[in-house]
């Protein structure tokens, strides 16, 4: 049986990083077009016109079943992304700031999960969606910044990988 730590390599981290970007992007796009088909949202260019939100396209059945399933798979990929980064940097003996980075990354995953769980209508759902997405974005930005600084400062350790 292959040990988990031996499976964690730069190539696998690259694949997980790409999947963690592509899967939620495709999920949102497909959910958007399905929401248009079911008349939950109007056709527009959301990035330019601001006519709908990601929450709105994944809120109503049957689209929300598709949306939530694939977003939870995305959350799992993001979780793996943080695990892989932590193990790769731990192999090099860099633990001090990376423990904080890992902790914030995992917190962001937890709050992203809360955001997905609380998709729905009403003030109760709206409150938890806003809290979940705000904290997710905040912790993601901070943890990615710390991760980038860690890799940049210690880039000489990763030259041969």
Summary of predicted features, one role per range:
Residues 5-25, 161:
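Alpha-helical transmembrane segments and their helix-start/interface "positive-inside/aromatic belt" motifs
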Residues 10, 87-100, 153-161:
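Membrane-interface helix-boundary motifs at transmembrane edges
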Residues 24-43:
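Alpha-helical transmembrane segments of multi-pass membrane proteins
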Residues 40-61, 119-131:
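Membrane-interface interhelical loops and short amphipathic "cap" helices
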Residues 53-75:
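Interfacial helix-start motif at the membrane-water boundary
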Residues 71-89:
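Transmembrane alpha-helical segments in integral membrane proteins
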Residues 100-110:
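Membrane-embedded alpha-helical bundles of multi-pass transporters/translocases
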Residues 108-160:
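Membrane-proximal helix-loop-helix units in multi-pass membrane proteins
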